Amino acid sequence: MTEKISILIVQSNPQVGNIDKNKQIVIDHIESNKSDLIIFSELMLTGYPPEDLVLKPAFMEKVNNAISDILNCSKNSNSTIIIGTPFLEESKLFNTALVIKKGKILHKHHKMALPNYGVFDEKRIFSNGEQVSIIEFNGIKLGLFICEDIWVNDT
């Protein structure tokens, strides 16, 4: 196990729908930091809540292009990156945390507890993830959760 791990938690204010600006925030942090682990927020690439924007194919194409750009940027970094993004898999749209290192997606955690009350209507847009994600990072087991996952008993 590593004795010391440096972790950067990025608290930014991503703009809903401004994928280019949000992606640039991510790339700037990857290029300028040497942290072992860089963690970005839920739905960092799209801003929160993206609502019906993620249902538009052209918007999701921009999201996928941004993910590709971030993967490419990560090739030159030793950091492991965790970033929130909408992610289409097997014809289902998920609110996902991607774990990225050296140009590869190492793991995907799909949010399990989708809120559907008050101003939140994630169940209308996203599919539920089905399992808790545990990853190994520098000899340490880490659980991945997205927002409401952490305080709902059945997740």
Question: How would you label these PLM feature ranges?
Answer:
Residues M1-T155:
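Enzyme catalytic cores with a strong preference for nitrogen-chemistry domains
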